[in-house]
Amino acid sequence: MALLLLLLPLLALQAESTTFTFTNKCKTTVWPGALSNSGTAPLGTTGFELPTGATRAVQAPAGWSGRFFARTGCTFDSSGHGTCATADCGSGQVECNGAGAAPPATLAEFTLAGPSSSQDFYDVSLVDGYNIAMLVEASGGCAATGCAVDLNRRCPAELRVGDGDGQACRSACEAFGTPEYCCKGAYANPGTCRPSVYSQMFKSACPRSYSYAFDDPTSTFTCTGPADYSITFCPDSTPSQKATRDSTTTSAPKAKGVVLEGGGGEGGSEGESWLASLAVGSGAPSRTRVSILHQASLTLFSTTVAIFLLFLGFC
């Protein structure tokens, strides 16, 4: 009886834990990393190798919050020391040991239900740029989210870095560092920091991922009740529409699954310019194309007015 009483807290903790299952569908090995938020205990692992086709489960306790990412183009020696071409956490080891990913990096962010909340909150963020396609799916019918498009193959030249396994797509903030792109200073609130042409391009390709700092209404999802999560790198198909259970974006109507355009995570045309493809486009016009055309129309109108006024001055 005494032994049972000692085991009860352990059994309760196990029942409240969440399982994250990582699957690698990329053509090459990836090295997932984990970073716990401040005040949150670290997980049992902070980084590991995940070969092509492999799956690994990681447990997280109730109330855990943090982020996951995948490093690519890594070279580690037999003692586990080395570096990665993208999303390197700077630890010099397979384990990240409390360090986060260097941008550009695709991030899956979670805050699990705990004493202060009965809901899980989760999102996939491109705010720090993009290095790999990622899909997050929740058990129990809660909504999927992520970015299944290979943005590296369609990244604008001014945002593109690296090549091969080290290729990635920077955010406009990292590339240009200005307050309006980084939502800092006078732009540090939703009213003044608006989506740029670049963040609109990210949003057009991956409509349920964070595209800039204040993209909350369509990018943060919740799940009520116990749920486990699968995180797939380079997902090979777009998930179908499906019903959800108690799963919503934080400021939007209930979602019915997720449409991740572009199919497989390693598809796309080599060397295709994302900006050019959006400008000329195919199918229904996107908000990004409309925005670009609107800006061009305003510029043309302003130029015409200036020439007309100049002509009147000569007369």
Q: Residues of each region from the PLM?
A:
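Extracellular low-complexity, O-glycosylation-prone Ser/Thr/Pro/Gly-rich "stalks"
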Residues: A2-C315
